[in-house]
UniProtKB/Swiss-Prot annotation:
PANTHER family documented for this protein: 1-D-DEOXYXYLULOSE 5-PHOSPHATE SYNTHASE-RELATED, 1-DEOXY-D-XYLULOSE-5-PHOSPHATE SYNTHASE, CHLOROPLASTIC
Cofactor(s) demanded: Mg(2+); thiamine diphosphate
EC number(s) given by UniProt: 2.2.1.7
Coiled coil: none
NCBIfam families, A to Z: dxs, PRK05444.2-2
Catalytic activity field: D-glyceraldehyde 3-phosphate + pyruvate + H(+) = 1-deoxy-D-xylulose 5-phosphate + CO2
Protein species of origin: Thermomicrobium roseum (strain ATCC 27502 / DSM 5159 / P-2)
Subunit-structure text: Homodimer.
EC supergroup of this enzyme: transferase
Official protein name in the record: 1-deoxy-D-xylulose-5-phosphate synthase
Gene Ontology terms: cellular component: cytosol
Cofactor note: Binds 1 Mg(2+) ion per subunit. Binds 1 thiamine pyrophosphate per subunit.
């Protein structure tokens, strides 16, 4: 066993290439065992980067040399050889290793990651810092072909080419996303080859060659030479024009070739681009056969009861149904057709479906352009990724009052993916925008109605936020109906306290009301439905009736839903005790969604206990009523 002897990258340097190859096999076995059998997580990407990881750590000297991994989907082998082998079984578990890169987790994690296309910018900053401070170390950015579709990556490449500082960019090309880019270059070169002047020159050269002895043979050789040259040009021209020396393509599973290549590029004093070809899912045949399906893996519990449909699937199916009745509906996603539930829509309406790649800024403005021409674009993007297009939401959509629908999946606490993926800021960053309508469903059935509402709303942009995972199991009967804009839902009436809950916290709020009822406390419960516009009338009536109020949200408290309710009360001159429950001013790490909600104090038991303490503090109940909680 070689893996058990690797406590740091320095240990790799004592191994021969054949021993490194055996180590690669052991690393794959460890990833398969842990990810498939224990923790879940990103699977196929990590299997594809084992040899690349070993070669980088064999040639370079981390942590002195800076290896910056993009996104982090491919960082498990890196974690295994940088002193975290003994904790690898805790990956993505509460209190365990992160599934992504975190600077505080290891000195070998030089830059935190979770979102795509950031590695080259960060690595370039480190390379420039070395030059300014007179330090001597190598800087390497490792980026996948999927992340390379992000515009930020090209901004960084352009800047690096201009600065001409030593920087190594490694493209991990598993052919999952780069084909459209290559196709665009191919189309450009095709236009050159079909230009009249080019074709005339080609005919004249061939005519002259045929006059020579062995002329036909020379013509054949010229064609073969041009074909080879064309292939080289396709691969190298863009990187050379950006100011990089291009090397590749390299077999990403040939350790000897990788090591020799990296030893060579260590000597460069200007930007170099190393093109590495890998197989996503390498070493696990089902993942090699279907890397898309095996991009990430979830642990399956034998005998587990069936779960309700996932929010993303309810969204996707409802959109298909609505699109059948309205040919103006189009769907847009940024490289997440499966995660957003849009694969059925893509299959049913391929001409009305657009996957723009990792390009959220473009996705939003593209949707705005579609909306100017009378179409009804639905832009389905994870809440955390919509942050990347905030200026476009303001400048290109809200200012122009364009009817774009923003379907924000993974809103709230997402679980094991952790701090980079929680969608907890959207309420604050969207409710402040003029012309924006913002709503959140309490369950999967209400999601159907809110999607219908959004598509019926033509007066400007409208956003709906909904959580990751399965719904709550309510029946979904009848056609989706249009809800009144800005109208909340009164779920139960009481006179002791009013609980106003948003989205996924409505059901826990109802359960908390049941707990309070056991203590003789009668609570009004309101499903807010809308953050903007708020149902001012219902909220103010409940506040006056009860004399105190609790808000609950699975979002950041600062600037959030509770703040909107406080503003409404203040504007009405209604000064009553208010308790805001939501996410405190910190980043939440990875854990199960249930655990994270307990940490945040927004599960049913926490809502009830905190409400009891709140009522006692303000003299609404006797302190003894909460003594046993």
């Amino acid at each position: 066993m070689y893996l058990e002897r690797i406590d740091s990258p320095q240990d790799l340097k004592r191994l021969s290439v054949p021993e490194l190859e055996k180590l690669a096999e052991e690393i794959r076995e460890a990833i398969i065992e842990v990810v498939l059998g224990k923790t879940g997580g990103h699977f196929a990407p990590n299997l594809g980067t084992v040899e690349l990881t070993l070669a980088l750590h064999y040639v370079f000297d981390s942590p002195r040399d800076k290896i910056v991994w993009d996104v982090g989907h491919q960082a498990y082998p890196h974690k295994l050889v940088t002193g975290r082998r003994d904790r690898f079984h805790t990956i993505r578990q509460e209190g365990g290793l992160s599934g992504f890169l975190q600077r505080e987790e290891s000195p070998h994690d030089h830059f935190g990651a979770g979102h795509a296309s950031t590695s080259i910018s960060a690595a370039l900053g480190m390379a420039v810092a070395a030059k300014l401070r007179g330090d001597r170390y190598h800087t390497i950015a490792v980026i996948g072909d999927g992340a390379l579709t992000g515009g930020m990556a090209y901004e960084a490449l352009n800047h690096a080419g201009a600065l001409q500082v030593p920087l190594i960019v490694v493209l991990n090309d598993n052919e999952m996303s780069i084909a459209p880019n290559v196709g665009a270059l191919a189309r450009y070169l095709t236009r050159v080859r079909t230009d009249t002047r080019y074709r005339q020159a080609k005919v004249e050269i061939e005519r002259l060659l045929r006059r020579l002895p062995q002329g036909e043979r020379l013509v054949e050789l010229s064609h073969r030479f041009l074909d080879g040259l064309k292939e080289v040009v396709y691969r190298t021209m863009i990187w050379e024009e950006l100011g990089f020396t291009y090397i590749g393509p390299i077999d990403g599973h040939n350790l000897r070739e990788l090591i020799e290549t990296f030893q060579l590029v260590k000597t460069f004093d200007s930007p170099v681009f190393v093109h590495v070809l890998t197989v996503k899912g390498k070493g696990y045949q089902p993942a090699e056969d279907d890397p898309f399906k095996h991009h990430s893996a979830a642990v399956k519990v034998p005998g587990a009861p069936p779960t309700p449909p996932r929010y993303q699937d309810v969204f996707g199916q409802t959109l298909v149904e609505l699109a059948a009745k309205n040919d103006r509906i189009v769907a847009i996603t940024a490289a997440m057709p499966d995660g957003t539930g849009l694969l059925p829509f893509a299959a049913a309406y391929p001409d009305r479906f657009f996957d723009v790649g990792i390009a959220e800024q473009h996705a939003v403005t593209f949707a705005a352009g579609l909306a100017t021409q009378g179409l009804r674009p639905v832009c389905a993007i994870y809440s955390t990724f919509l942050q990347r297009a905030y200026d476009q939401v303001i400048h290109d959509v809200c200012i122009q009052k364009l009817p774009v629908v923003f379907a924000m999946d993974r809103a709230g606490l997402v679980g094991e993916d952790g701090r980079t993926h929680h969608g907890v800021f959207d309420v604050a960053y969207l409710r402040c925008l003029p012309n924006m309508v913002l709503m959140a469903p309490k369950d999967e059935d209400e999601l159907r109605h809110m999607l219908a509402t959004a598509l019926a709303y033509e007066e400007g942009p409208i956003a709906l936020r909904y959580p990751r995972g399965s719904g709550v199991g309510v029946p979904m009967l009848g056609e989706p109906r249009v809800l009144p804009i800005g109208r909340a839902e009164l779920l139960r009436e009481g006179s002791d306290v009013a609980i106003v809950a948003l989205g996924a916290t409505v059901l826990p709020a109802e359960r908390a009301a049941d707990i309070l009822a056991e203590r003789g406390i009668r609570a009004t419960v309101i499903n807010a439905r809308f953050v903007k516009p708020l149902d001012r009338s219902l909220i103010l009536d409940a506040a006056r009736e009860c004399g105190c109020l609790v808000t609950v949200e699975e979002a950041q408290l600062a600037g959030g839903f509770g703040s909107a309710v406080l503003e409404t009360l203040a504007d009405a001159g209604l000064l009553i005790p208010v308790l805001r429950l939501g996410l405190a001013d910190r980043f939440f790490d990875h854990a199960s969604q249930a655990s994270l909600r307990r940490q945040a104090g927004i599960d049913a038991e926490s809502i009830a206990s905190r409400t009891l303490a709140f009522l006692a503090t303000h003299g609404r109940i006797e302190t003894g009523a909460i003594s046993d909680r």
